[in-house]
Amino acid sequence: MTIIRKKHPLIKIINHSFIDLPAPSNISSWWNFGSLLGLCLAIQILTGLFLAMHYTSDTATAFSSVAHICRDVNYGWLIRYMHANGASMFFICLFLHVGRGIYYGSYNMIETWNMGIILLFAVMATAFMGYVLPWGQMSFWGATVITNLLSAIPYVGTTLVEWIWGGFSVDKATLTRFFAFHFILPFIITALVLVHLLFLHETGSNNPTGLNSDADKIPFHPYYTIKDFLGVLILLMAFMILTLFFPDILGDPDNYTPANPLNTPPHIKPEWYFLFAYAILRSIPNKLGGVLALVLSILVLALMPLLHTSKQRALTFRPITQTMYWILVADLLILTWIGGQPVEYPFIIIGQTASIAYFTIIMILMPIAGMIENNILDLD
């Protein structure tokens, strides 16, 4: 068996990636989220495939086909709710994975980090298009509002929006193409994940100290396969509790009303995992400025390697930057809350303050804190 594992041209790739891979001996549970994201992706592709067997991407029948899946298909309700809540679990793991990367300075592995940002954009695009497919009120109006943001692009904006819509409004053509893209993107994401792993295995994993761990490595299997399996069990338990006991807690009641272009819901808002970006978008009165801020809220992550001023990699031994980091986490929670609130006083001013704080902490305060810590520790 060992000979096949190490000699077979295909199996040896798996062997070098998941079995004999040298891994730091001290990586904590924060390093579990990569494998959990892989599990989430697998769940989403499988449940999505079964949903696609019964779904029809036509404005006249899309809503009914989802109802049919829930009522008439064997365990259709379970597949549908696993897919809907699987997206939420996916984003919870994504945010924790990115948060871990920021805390421990993993962004210094630039290729891996940039690939991760591309993956984040791809997953967000996939989730957005998936939200449109049930063709409920929030699906329709969410698609209208978000795609309409592209009209803020000078000169080509309006043409671009109509090109994406396939007409003069969100309609049958839009739904059909969104279904096509929503189906193909997870497979593209899978390919990007392999590239992400390829880049990671070029440098090796980071660890909680942020120090070089070449002198202290252990094989990935059995140590981290067992550890990852524990993470998988915990995630699946949380996931099934959410899916079986509280399937609608993260959804919007408006999406149980069929899409109606003549009736606008009182509060148009995306799914919870986009609310922080939506709050940043709404906090700027100018349309183009809002769109730029929305894109920058994610793209600012690409600047992190350039903004790293500390002589240390991780925040483990850097209390000042640690404080900034946790303020940033609190700020993101505030933005998520604001994104779900109506556009009125005091929510507008809170959203604007939190948006300014978000960019200020990442681009100004954390680099300054890094320099201060260098001086305190005489690391210059």
UniProtKB/Swiss-Prot annotation:
TM spans (from-to): 33-53, 77-98, 113-133, 178-198, 226-246, 288-308, 320-340, 347-367
Alphabetical list of Gene3D superfamilies matching this protein: Cytochrome Bc1 Complex, Chain C
GO CC terms of this entry: mitochondrial inner membrane; respiratory chain complex III
GO biological process annotation, one example: mitochondrial electron transport, ubiquinol to cytochrome c
Major location (coarse): mitochondrion
InterPro entries: Cyt_b/b6_C, Cyt_b/b6_C_sf, Cyt_b/b6_N, Cytb/b6-like_sf, Cytochrome_b, Cytochrome_b_C_euk/bac, Cytochrome_b_N_euk/bac, Di-haem_cyt_TM
Entry binding sites for a ubiquinone: 201
Binding site for heme b b566: 97, 196
Membrane topology: Multi-pass membrane protein
Alphabetized GO MF terms: metal ion binding; ubiquinol-cytochrome-c reductase activity
Cofactor descriptive note: Binds 2 heme b groups non-covalently.
Record-listed heme b b562 binding positions: 83, 182
Named cofactor requirement(s): heme b
Family affiliation: Belongs to the cytochrome b family.
Protein name per the record: Cytochrome b
